[in-house]
């Protein structure tokens, strides 16, 4: 183990690594579940495509805004570092611990449980909880071998996801789909949708787009930070958005929105398998189910890598025990990885998939909105601050992001009051830890860190 004083992360990652982190982190459970859950409620192919397009716009606005902050503070930690430097140590701690516990541990548990559910269709005797536990343990061990090794896994995962989705799109458009016509000729008009229905679907789509900010959490390990983050995040996000729209078009060729329900009236959660079975037959559908398992494990692996860096960053600030900053000889934050793994296993054991999805989506939406607002506050308070990168068309991207964030959060809170309790509960726990321990140990930001 390295002594704590030498625990500086090396910048081993480049532009394509940053893009790979975006692709690998974004493409996961969401694209293979969300459309099936909400298509029938949306009622038309146009509405399905519109909600995914607006989700892409939201992610683009968030990406451009986060790049400005990441260029100011090119260190590991993402939203935690940004909020800490803008709003102060307490706010940064609340955000950091919320992201670490709910955003990353929760997301890892969600992907793990989804992976377990898909795996049970291959091996019915293995429960989703058991398979999720095995997947989390394997991913954690991989990342303990070092940054280069885990980065190789992530880049291979990103390449595999692009090949899989591109293959699905090309093959999907090559067959004669008689179940439904392409979205432009599907009946229905999105202007007839209620705001609450569209907002609820948007919240689910936003979860599918989560991951566009992943490179900001490992910025301390990225070379030529300004160029790599700017192009890596933007290209990765645009590539995923294009793939998402094309994949959903394929889903709509397989079935009209009103057909994406089971005979008992429940939505088709496994929309990937459902669509491929209708387009290509049972054999291909079963094979696609196995490929989805690989996609889900790749996403789980990437999220585990990024999430541990939040604990690492908070440990360096003195807000969590210094043991979390310990790196092994290969440069991996092994203690942070172990703590994260233990937390994920507890979530898998004691929570359900639905509750996790709702809480993760709401809390991360609120956090990202607060972070984006910080860009506007910095422009007002420190207009002369040297900025290596400036948001194009400012203030349009951050304003669009904030408006959509408030609307989505309001829609979720209205439809599911439990999300309010979970959100307030998370904030309460983080504040208790702050006043009970972290406030006394937190080190103030250096003069070069604080910008607000």
Language-model-detected regions and their locations in the chain:
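C-terminal membrane-solvent junction of multi-pass transporters and transport-like membrane proteins
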Residues: 323-334, 368-419
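Helix-loop-helix connectors at the membrane interface of multi-pass transporters/channels
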Residues: 1-5, 80-84, 112-131, 164, ...
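Helix-loop-helix junctions that connect adjacent transmembrane segments
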Residues: 2-10, 49, 124-127, 156-289
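A generic transmembrane alpha-helix motif of multi-pass inner-membrane proteins
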Residues: 358-363, 393-452
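Membrane-interface loop-to-helix entry segments
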Residues: 116, 128-181, 233-237, 360-370, ...
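Hydrophobic transmembrane alpha-helices that form the core helical bundles
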Residues: 37-40, 60-136, 140-144, 288, ...
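TM-loop-TM module centered on a large, flexible mid-protein loop between adjacent transmembrane helices
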Residues: 81-82, 88, 121, 232-301, ...
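Membrane-interface "cap" regions at the ends of multi-pass membrane proteins
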Residues: 1-36, 40-46, 59-60, 64, ...
């Amino acid at each position: 183990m390295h002594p704590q004083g030498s625990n500086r992360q090396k910048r081993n990652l480049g532009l394509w690594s940053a893009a790979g982190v975006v692709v690998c982190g974004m493409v996961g459970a969401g694209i293979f579940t969300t459309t099936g859950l909400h298509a029938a409620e949306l009622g038309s192919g146009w509405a399905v495509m519109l909600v995914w397009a607006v989700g892409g716009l939201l992610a683009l606005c968030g990406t451009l805004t986060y790049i400005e902050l990441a260029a100011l503070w090119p260190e590991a930690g993402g939203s935690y570092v940004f909020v800490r430097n803008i709003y102060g140590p307490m706010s940064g701690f609340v955000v950091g611990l919320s992201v670490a516990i709910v955003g990353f541990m929760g997301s890892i548990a969600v992907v793990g449980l989804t992976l377990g559910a898909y795996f049970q269709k291959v091996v019915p005797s293995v429960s989703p909880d058991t398979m999720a536990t095995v997947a989390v343990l394997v991913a954690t061990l991989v990342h303990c071998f070092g940054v280069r090794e885990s980065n190789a896994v992530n880049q291979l995962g990103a390449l595999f996801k692009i090949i899989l989705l591109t293959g699905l799109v090309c093959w999907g458009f090559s067959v004669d789909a008689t179940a439904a016509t392409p979205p432009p000729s599907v009946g229905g008009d999105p202007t007839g949708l209620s705001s609450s229905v569209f907002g609820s679907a948007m919240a689910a789509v936003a979860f599918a787009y989560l991951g566009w900010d992943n490179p900001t959490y490992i910025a301390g390990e990225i070379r030529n930070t300004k160029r790599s983050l700017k192009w890596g995040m933007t290209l990765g996000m645009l590539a995923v958005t294009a793939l998402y729209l094309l994949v959903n078009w394929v889903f709509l060729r397989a079935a009209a929105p009103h057909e994406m329900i089971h005979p008992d009236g429940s939505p088709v959660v496994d929309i990937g398998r459902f669509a491929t079975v209708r387009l290509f037959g049972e054999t291909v559908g079963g094979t696609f189910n196995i490929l989805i398992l690989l996609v889900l494990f790749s996403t789980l692996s990437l999220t585990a890598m990024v999430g541990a860096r939040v604990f690492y960053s908070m440990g360096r600030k003195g807000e969590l025990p210094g043991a979390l900053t310990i790196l092994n000889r290969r440069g991996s934050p092994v203690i942070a990885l172990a703590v994260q793994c233990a937390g994920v296993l507890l979530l898998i054991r004691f929570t359900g998939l639905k509750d996790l999805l709702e809480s993760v989506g709401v809390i991360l939406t609120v956090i990202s909105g607060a972070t984006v607002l910080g860009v506007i506050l910095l422009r007002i308070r420190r207009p002369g601050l040297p900025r290596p990168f400036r948001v194009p068309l400012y203030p349009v991207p951050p304003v669009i992001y904030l408006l959509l964030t408030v609307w989505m959060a309001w829609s979720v809170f209205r439809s599911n009051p439990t999300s309010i309790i979970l959100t307030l509960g998370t904030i309460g726990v983080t504040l208790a830890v702050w006043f009970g321990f972290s406030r006394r140990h937190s080190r103030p930001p250096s003069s070069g860190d604080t910008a607000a």
